[in-house]
């Protein structure tokens, strides 16, 4: 079953509110309906089909066991990105994008290993022989690593696609993804450029209601793709049994 969002839901979430007209990026002109009170209004008749297309891509990817990394490190996006990525079992970055997270993944994997080792020490604190101060320092280090790497610690390799809230804020992420040929689904507001974004979603990237709508829609698409894949496996098994 498909759970594509509707035009009404987009309007209610304020997806159509862009930035102040003086901050606009002319490359977004084709997605802009007009302006009101010096605020650009995004044309939802453009946004809706583009978002549906992005969801369809994610469904196909998830049905083929693909991975979509959710990225949203600005204040309004953090909690939403973390919740929705966790709901659909996908990796996420919600704290700070560390340079090389994709392009230097080998080093990142070593940091994840270090995080796991230190956590294991903390869990067996009684038998380790560490004193109180050493354990406290260790706990601080684990918390710091967890903030940066917690969302990607179960990732088995590079993601197959990246879903980004606010392409201007996450420039570093997009540069790394492009270098590696990883497709990017990006929410692009009127003050940013759609260049280099494979699946452009023109929309408000500041409102938490709008951010929730995008993240939930992509997470739903992941779950639907996986469910479809499971149905196909079950159907194939039943056919084989019948034969």
From Swiss-Prot:
Family, per entry: Belongs to the universal ribosomal protein uS2 family.
Entries under InterPro entries matching the protein: Ribosomal_uS2 (IPR001865), Ribosomal_uS2_bac/mit/plastid (IPR005706), Ribosomal_uS2_CS (IPR018130), Ribosomal_uS2_flav_dom_sf (IPR023591)
CDD domains: RPS2 (cd01425)
NCBIfam families to which the protein is assigned, alphabetical: rpsB_bact
Keyword terms of this UniProt record: Ribonucleoprotein, Ribosomal protein
CC per GO annotation: cytosolic small ribosomal subunit
UniProt superkingdom: Bacteria
GO biological process: translation
Record-annotated membrane-spanning stretches: none
Gene: rpsB
One Pfam family, short name: Ribosomal_S2
Keyword 4Fe-4S included in the entry's annotation: no
MF term (GO), any: structural constituent of ribosome
Protein name as annotated: Small ribosomal subunit protein uS2
């Amino acid at each position: 079953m498909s759970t594509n969002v509707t035009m009404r839901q987009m309007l209610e979430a304020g997806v159509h509110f862009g930035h102040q007209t003086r901050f606009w990026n002319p490359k977004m002109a084709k997605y802009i309906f007009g302006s009101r009170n010096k605020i650009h209004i995004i044309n939802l008749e453009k946004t809706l089909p583009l978002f549906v297309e992005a969801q369809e891509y994610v469904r196909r990817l998830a049905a083929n066991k693909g991975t979509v990394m959710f990225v949203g490190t600005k204040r309004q996006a953090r909690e939403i990105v973390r919740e929705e990525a966790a709901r659909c079992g996908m990796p996420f970055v919600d704290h700070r994008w560390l340079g090389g997270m994709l392009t230097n993944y080998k080093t990142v994997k070593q940091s994840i290993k270090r995080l796991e080792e230190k956590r294991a020490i903390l869990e067996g604190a009684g038998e380790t022989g560490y004193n109180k101060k050493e354990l406290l320092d260790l706990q601080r280090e684990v918390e710091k690593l967890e903030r940066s790497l917690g969302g990607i610690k179960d990732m088995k390799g590079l993601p197959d696609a990246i879903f980004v809230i606010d392409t201007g804020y996450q420039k570093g992420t997009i540069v790394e993804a492009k270098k590696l040929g990883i497709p990017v689904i990006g929410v692009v507001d009127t003050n940013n450029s759609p260049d280099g974004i494979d699946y452009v979603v023109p929309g408000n990237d500041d409102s938490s209601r709008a951010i929730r709508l995008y993240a939930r829609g992509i997470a739903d698409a992941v779950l639907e793709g996986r469910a479809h894949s499971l149905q196909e496996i079950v159907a194939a098994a039943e056919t084989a049994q019948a034969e």
